Amino acid sequence: MKFTLSWLKEHLETEASVQEIADTLTRIGHEVESVHNPADGLEAFRIARILTAERHPQADRLQILAVDVGESEPLQVVCGAANARAGLVGVFAAPGVYVPGIDVTLKIASIRGVESRGMMCSIRELGLGDEHEGILDLPHEAPVGQSYVEWAGLDDPVFDVAITPDRQDCMGVRGLARDLATAGIGRLKPLAIPRVPVTDAAPAEIAIEDKEGCPAFFGQLIHGIQNGPSPEWMARRLRAIGFRPTSALVDITNYIMFDLGRPLHVYDAGAIKGKLTARKAQNNEKIEALNGKSYDLDPSITVIADDQGVKNIAGIMGAEKASVSGSTTDVIIECAYFDPAAVSQAGQKLGLASDARIRFERGVDPAFLNEGLQIAARMVLDFCGGKATQAVTLGEAPSAVPVISYDPSYVTSLAAMDVAPARQREILEQLGFAIDAGWRVRVPSFRRDVSVVADIVADIVRIEGLDNVPSTALDRGDGVARPIATHGQLTERRVRRAAAAFGMNEAVTWSFISEKDANIFGGAFWKLANPISEDMKVMRPSLLPGLLTAAKRNRDRGQSTIRLFEVGRRYLQEAERPTLGLIFAGERMSRDWQYGKSQNFDAYDAKTAVSAMLDSVGMPVEKLQLLGDAGDVYHPGRSGRLCLGPKNTLAVFGEIHPAILAEFNMEGPVIGAEIFLDALPLRKNSGQLRQPYAPSMLQPVFRDFAFLLPKDVPAADLVRSIAGADKNAIVEARIFDVFTGETIDENEKSLGIEVMLQPAEKSFTDAELQGISDKIVAAAAKKGARLRA
């Protein structure tokens, strides 16, 4: 919602500064997104008159102008605007002036051999709009040499305020002025309802068939108008909020909508055949709307139509065929009340948005129909002339308003604020509420958001100021334990920290994905009944689709190394499961003079990361089983799963299958992993503190072994067996070499394993070392391995 300071002062008598107004609006619940003064940076632009315009000798599209800028001698300016001509009064920028619309500081220049000492400017070049087909053409009487900002009244700050969906009454400047006045920023001026003289001529012919979609339809016919430009003050305000002035009739409806929050529509009466009727659309009816698009209608949509067809989608947008133009002489002004739900559903079905729709679907003031029509008719008569017929009022808008039994003590009990009853009454009455002696509060017709006591308290609190609500801790009842994090919360916290420590970036992706992607990653189990779009139709069965999309977006923007993780929920048929998802894409190591060409991530990077995350939550990583069959998402030969026992899968990892990467239009390799946090067992609490680490005073001993092992036996099984051969002496066992080739059997592989032995109280003797080695060989033999000769 945008408005200017001068516009606000039409309704609010105030001397408050721009900053005070902005701060107060935000304090009472209307967040000010920006305040912009169009005059900033335009102080140096002056009004100038073109004395002569001659063709440039070296360019057909350029003219050499002699420009009077109010100085003793005219200045020479080279100009390419098609409308530049002798006698035109426009806006001039001298050398040294910064032109914001084109981001250029002017200087004296030679253009095709002719010196130019400045520039005649267009609306776009001034940064005041998008019009750029020609230079500004001001009224002939505009004073040459005067500041354009001063003459045009541009020193008028523009506020941009975010109005919450429940406050339709503040979708007009007057509603905001009412709130500001209540907050002590000024005095609300009374709204004058003008008198409209009428003739005895036949009134507008209107009717209502769809009383649910259009409970009330008011209309007034005005004859003999001349639809010229709107007054400069109105055009200036509309331009300031981003509207291009079109004609007086169109500008009047837009102005009243933003001024009073009352949408209207004006029809060219000459294009109407028969009665204007509010009815349901018929099957296969179409409308060519004012936005230039065609829409197919159906009987669920309320329309305004004549004998020839639809002339308006009720509360949303009119038809091109009944629109007003410069040749319009007779008009019908529509001021109606349309059902908010019907307008909202029609707009969603047609995919059609408008400023009128926003206001109607939030609910306009049903008690302001006649007043809105009178104000519009008076403006038409004042700006366009003509004679008005008697207004026609059909139907009745909803008139029931809540009457709420209230007690001033509710503010203390609900908001912990101490506000005197007299002050509460003052606030409510200034906001438009009526209060009798027994504190029965009658809600104003324009406040659809107020229906219970808590709503009244909320109004009082926001006007008094949330800053005045004391910060008070809630009382903790006897026997109520202090809040502690659950096991699941602690687990998520630990793995999140571990992932960040591993050098990964946390991502937050949508929980909704397309049905196509869901089927790729396990199935579309939870479908939304009313999805935002087809791409957000299903609750994700895996975190990988969102992470893959994020990785692709980053790669498309030039990122060569991507490490992403997310902690979130997967939605499966039986339940939702907390999960940690990981994605590695691109280069693990960039090309380097020392290491040569770049190296991409592989499945081992994912295994290392997963192991680190599991270790952070106390899982015995060295005891986990590494199995294949990670699922169809992964490359069958470059993936695996870590299990605590054969049935409890803690994590899956590996290279994403090329077919899935093709679905996401990505090039591999891309590495992924998921850790199933709810599968992690609870850590047993012994009740004792962990003993501090005490490093041995003795040197460790390293022994290397080379074993021949059947190819179908996982290397991890052998390593785990060796590590358990003598738990008192063996600290670690790890693979340092893998070999297959002609010198060994084709069904075997050679593994080089380094074993770290740590003596406790004294160094190992040769006999002890030999005994440990024998245990290692025996443990390996249980897995089918033998020492390589």
From Swiss-Prot:
SUPFAM superfamilies: Anticodon-binding domain of PheRS (SSF54991), Class II aaRS and biotin synthetases (SSF55681), Nucleic acid-binding proteins (SSF50249), PheT/TilS domain (SSF56037), Putative DNA-binding domain (SSF46955). It catalyses: tRNA(Phe) + L-phenylalanine + ATP = L-phenylalanyl-tRNA(Phe) + AMP + diphosphate + H(+). GO terms for cellular component: phenylalanine-tRNA ligase complex. Mg(2+) binds at residues 449, 455, 459. It is found in: Cytoplasm. Residues 399-471 form the B5 domain. Its main location: cytoplasm. One of its GO terms (molecular function) is tRNA binding. Its EC number is 6.1.1.20. The keyword RNA-binding applies. Residues 39-149 form the tRNA-binding domain. Binds 2 magnesium ions per tetramer. It comes from the Bacteria. Residues 696-788 form the FDX-ACB domain. Transmembrane segments: none annotated. This is Phenylalanine--tRNA ligase beta subunit. It comes from Zymomonas mobilis subsp. mobilis (strain ATCC 31821 / ZM4 / CP4).
